[in-house]
Amino acid sequence: MQYQVDTHTHTVASTHAYSTIHDYLAVAKQKGILLFATTDHGPAMADAPHFWHFVNLRVLPRMVDGVGILRGIEANIKNIDGEIDFFGDYLKQLDIVLAGFHEPVYPPSDKATHTEAMINTIKSGKVDIITHPGNPAYPIDIDAVARAAAEYGVALEINNSSFEVSRKGSEANCTAIAKAAKEFGTILVMGSDSHVAFSLGGFERALAIIDAAGYPKSQLLNRSPSVLLGFLAQRGHHTVADLQALFDEAV
């Protein structure tokens, strides 16, 4: 199966990444990616873009040469209460909201604290996808998180970058997450977590984990633009309606 959607990418606006939106569009055309989300790090990260970057994402075209662009953020989970570093009505302007633990913002603590923080983030209703929940630096109660995500309709990410250049040792946790997701009916999504355009749509390692766990690939959000856009619309992102209309016209 060709997976046509990538929900997790970073641009030069996060200065430890190396590609522009234009770069991603070119690679998307080459790889058959029909929809990707630009999700730079939230403002609490030291080298993250300014708050205005996210407010002004509305200037991005909806579609360029058949490739759709989702306006998003990878926010930072800030504390045990599940608060993130983006807020209020500005969240409603975004098409997609990712959030995860990042050491410069929320240093690792203990399993119980990580679990409570992640579940509170899930319950907040502000976040659509939890990024790299298999990070071994942040052990969690996987079953508890998977159950909460299933209950609140939040997706858990299997992060391809975690098996290549970041978060070494994530394989066992991610396999357990995929197995728990299968058991509890939790939505999974693969994210490239691309920091350079060449890795856009790179899901090979994540897909191997999902296969090994026996999670049904027919339930992955990456299957098509309509699947992801339907998920986002159901979660209250009315901003995606015009993008869905463009894909409908292209059929």
Swiss-Prot record:
SMART domains: POLIIIAc. Its EC number is 3.1.3.-. SUPFAM superfamilies: PHP domain-like. Zn(2+) 3 binds at residues 74, 102, 132. One of its GO terms (cellular component) is cytosol. GO terms for biological process: bacterial-type flagellum-dependent swarming motility. Zn(2+) 2 binds at residues 16, 41, 195. CDD domains: PHP_HisPPase_Ycdx_like. Zn(2+) 1 binds at residues 8, 10, 74, 193. Binds 3 Zn(2+) ions per subunit. Keywords: Hydrolase, Metal-binding, Zinc. One of its GO terms (molecular function) is phosphatase activity. Pfam families: PHP (PF02811). It comes from the Bacteria. It is an enzyme of class 3 (hydrolase). HAMAP family: YcdX_phosphat (MF_01561). This is Probable phosphatase Sputcn32_1369. It comes from Shewanella putrefaciens (strain CN-32 / ATCC BAA-453).
